[in-house]
Curated annotation (Swiss-Prot):
It is an enzyme of class 3 (hydrolase). It is found in: Cytoplasm. The keyword Hydrolase applies. It comes from Clostridium botulinum (strain Okra / Type B1). This is dTTP/UTP pyrophosphatase.
Length: 194
């Protein structure tokens, strides 16, 4: 069995990976996301960010044998504009106000790197999420919980903001931050059967 390393500090990703893998390591990536400029293709961009994270972590590993590094990045897009993590409460409020009553996309890029062979596979998942119409009071109360501040698009579907979601089309786990079905098929492609 290969050693699996998750290149992420995200507790949500760690919790999700524990659902399908009993044994893995966590090494936080120090990849500078601003080193990859966004042009106009969100799926390519998110896969390149995931690869950057995986490669960044691979450089920290002394024992090159038998290690696979999983890099992942999740972005929220609305009207082909990327909504990252909010800078402050005002930014979070404005993001949620824009998403209110509208459909947006959540993209996750995945990259799995075999350190020894330098083989890498990349893919992405896109899930469409439709929010109900939200009142200013609902948004303000949610923003004041602090929950949106560390999340792309200023919300976490698995928390209090789950009530904002009218429907989703695609992978729920993608919206949380780690598309398990896609990850499983990619791990199988790299010789790991769960």
């Amino acid at each position: 069995m290969k050693n699996i390393i998750l290149a992420s500090a995200s507790e949500r990703r760690q919790e999700l990976l524990k659902r399908i893998l009993e044994d893995f390591q966590i090494i936080v990536s120090d990849f500078d996301e601003s080193s990859i400029p966004f042009k106009d293709n969100i799926s390519s961009y998110v896969m390149n960010l995931a690869e950057g994270k995986a490669r960044s972590v691979s450089k920290k590993i002394m024992d090159q044998d038998n290690n696979l590094v999983i890099g992942c990045d999740t972005l929220v897009a609305f009207n082909n504009k990327i909504l990252g993590k909010p800078k402050d409460k005002k930014d979070a409020f404005e993001m949620l106000q824009a998403l209110s009553g509208n459909e947006h996309e959540v993209y996750s890029g995945l990259a799995i790197l075999d350190i020894k062979s330098n083989k890498i596979i990349k893919d992405f998942v896109c899930t469409k999420v439709k929010f109900s119409k939200l009142t200013s009071l609902q948004i303000e109360k949610y923003v004041n919980t602090g929950d949106p501040m560390d999340k792309a698009g200023a919300y976490g579907i698995q928390g209090k903001a789950g009530v904002f979601v009218e429907n989703i089309n695609g992978c729920y786990y993608n919206v949380v931050g780690l598309p398990l079905n896609k990850l499983n098929s990619m791990l199988m492609e790299m010789g790991v059967n769960l």
